[in-house]
Swiss-Prot record:
HAMAP family: PQQ_syn_PqqB
Organism: Methylococcus capsulatus (strain ATCC 33009 / NCIMB 11132 / Bath)
Keywords, comma-separated and alphabetical: PQQ biosynthesis, Transport
SUPFAM superfamilies: Metallo-hydrolase/oxidoreductase
Keyword Transport attributed: yes
Pathway(s) it belongs to: Cofactor biosynthesis; pyrroloquinoline quinone biosynthesis
GO biological process, alphabetically ordered: pyrroloquinoline quinone biosynthetic process
Role this protein plays: May be involved in the transport of PQQ or its precursor to the periplasm, in association with PQQ biosynthesis, but is not absolutely required for this synthesis.
Protein's UniProt name: Coenzyme PQQ synthesis protein B
Similarity section: Belongs to the PqqB family.
Length: 304
């Protein structure tokens, strides 16, 4: 199984277009050891030819252009992307569907019932796309049972609900429902190795812990370093957990949890532009490295 990180940043990417936080300012001044990052998305394949896209970010066109395996190879109009799994209905994970409207066949979209509702009402992308290529929506199970995707041989997918947040536009932003956010286990049926993908994690529930323990690679929420990061950066008073993200540092933080999982490859993704781990010379980045935790970047490839 091949995992390609198309985008490793949180909403807005890095640098964010209107941000002058320490990281963004220093990046523009070329005074920081950091890589730019587009908004989070990955692609997964068993054979390197037929790929499943996880989330469709607003940066999808440039992400796919930088990813030769997705380019047309069998005719005038073609793509290596055969299906799309949506983790949630956040704007930075779904807007890219509009950029895929030139598809010559309906987009095969796998998502929860709650995401389907959001993308049919509050942010009606599915209805808009009916006037272009169309969408064939497939509802994923939330009980952890496995499913396969037609045309994607050698991979099995399992999904479960996570405690995080529905997007701000959703009518149930402050009234959580199962399926607002999901985690995904992708299993390589040839060798049994597993990826656990959860770019938005607000709480480690027992079923999440079990999935993390069973995985050979964890690609998980790296949004914030500290609970009050947005306040510390002078941006707003929202706390990390209020926005549905476990910070890396502090009691019960992501780093503490990852330190109890010594056998898996551990990679943080969905990294906010304010997070000091973007600076590869920072003490926070060094702390992660010493703990065996990687920071995802655009173009990273993982083989399981």
């Amino acid at each position: 199984m091949i995992i390609r990180v198309l985008g490793a940043g949180a909403g807005g990417g890095f640098p964010q277009w209107n941000c002058r936080c320490d990281n963004c300012r220093r990046f523009r001044e070329k005074n920081i050891n950091a890589r730019g990052r587009t908004q989070s998305s990955i692609a997964v394949s068993a054979d390197g030819q037929r790929w499943v896209l996880f989330n469709a970010s607003p940066d999808i066109r440039s992400q796919l252009e930088a990813f030769p395996a997705s380019h047309p190879s069998k005719g005038v109009r073609d793509t290596g992307i055969h299906a799309i799994v949506l983790i949630d209905s956040q704007i930075d994970h779904t807007t890219g569907l509009l950029m895929l409207r030139e598809s010559t066949r309906p987009l095969q979209v796998y998502c929860s019932e709650m995401v389907k509702q959001d993308l049919s009402t509050g942010f009606p992308l599915f209805r808009m796309l009916e006037h272009y290529c169309g969408v064939e929506q497939h509802t994923v199970p939330l009980d952890g049972s496995g499913f396969t995707i037609p045309g994607i041989e050698g991979l099995k997918f399992s999904t479960h609900s996570l405690k995080s947040k529905a997007p701000p536009y959703s009518p149930h932003r402050h009234d959580p429902h199962e399926g607002d956010n999901i985690g995904v286990i992708v299993e390589n049926l040839e060798n049994g190795r597993k990826l656990y993908y959860a770019p938005g994690l607000g709480e480690i529930e027992p079923h999440v812990r079990a999935a993390m323990e069973a995985a050979d690679c964890l690609l998980v929420d790296g949004t914030f370093w500290r609970e009050d990061e947005m306040r510390h950066a002078g941006i707003c008073d929202k706390l990390a957990r209020e926005m549905g993200h476990l910070p890396q540092s502090g009691p019960g933080g992501m780093l503490e949890i990852l330190n109890t999982l010594p056998n898996a490859r551990k990679v943080l993704i969905h990294i906010n532009n304010t997070n000091p781990i973007l600076d590869e010379d920072s003490p926070q980045y060094r702390t992660l490295s010493e703990a065996g935790v990687e920071v995802a970047y655009d173009g990273l490839e993982i083989v399981l």
